[in-house]
Amino acid sequence: YSVPVRGVFAVLLRVRGNVYRGAANVGIRPTVGDLVKPILEVHLLNFNKNIYGEKVSVEFMHKVRDEKKFSNIESLVRNIEKDVKTVEKWFEKQINDAN
């Protein structure tokens, strides 16, 4: 695998033959400050199944923003919510532009 530039991305995640839209973060989680090597975290949109332990593939579709350190956890949570909305709007635009 290859690690993209750090940041927040709109992604497509494939698992069990299905494709789901998501918002992903690639980075070291600077607000929490607990990592040295970057990791990938994906929040799937409108998804409530348990896929922990499953093999998945992630396709990076669009970069939303660079990784950022927030002043506190509350600010981080607000920005994650904003990122998810930005990703949802990006996917909606792709669908509308295709029609």
Task: Tell where the protein language model's regions lie, with residue ranges.
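Phosphate/ribose-recognition catalytic cores of enzymes acting on nucleotide-derived substrates
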Residues: Y1-N99
